[in-house]
Amino acid sequence: DFHADYYRENIVSVTFLDNASVPTNATESWDVSEDKKGGVIAYVIPNNEDSTKYDLYIGAQDGVIANSYSAYLFNGFTSVTKINFNDNFDTSNVTTMYSMFKKAAIKEIDLTSFNTGKVTDMNTMFGECANLEKITFGDFDTSNVIDMRGMFWLCTSLTELDLTSFNTLNTTSMRAMFMSCENLTKVNLCSFNTQNVTTMQDMFSGTTNLEIITVGEEWTTENANTNSMFSGSAISSVTTGQCG
């Protein structure tokens, strides 16, 4: 299907639709429904600006319901610069988003339509997204997320991150969460409750331009492995209590 190496390297945009019809100009189409009964269809069309590239469409009547295991969904889509969810991608049953966008070429992503209330695993969700400059989270629910390892690892184009929507009470691993985000200058962790985090190893390692992180009153490192937490970073202070 569209996860074949050829398409993963040549798809430039992804759009979710609320119907499962395939247009006549589709180069190739696939039944990507779990039961293989045609409920979810994916197809590619040559891109208007570059006919050697493709636009991917994924559709189902009333929108696509994501599989509970949505790991690697767009992993390695090295040419994808845009993903249009259009409120047609229901993530309410998803439990793992492990490496969901890893190595994708997206520059911006809007996750305001995502329902992540059941997700427990966001390990390397955006890992190695070197072109990613902006993430819009909205009311992003992380209250059940246990694993945030490498979530933003090697996101070298990110300059700011506002994670004030994050609830981290159940999170145990933040290892390498921001590791090698070399252009990150500002990160807001005001909502982070880290009392159950057991590892923060390499959390900010290699953040060579990050000087200040802002945390709230529920930030603590007392239960965590903090080896190399700030190794190679520019962090000069952890600012507590300026969370408004």
Regions found by a protein language model. Give the residues of each.
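Negatively charged
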Residues: 1-244
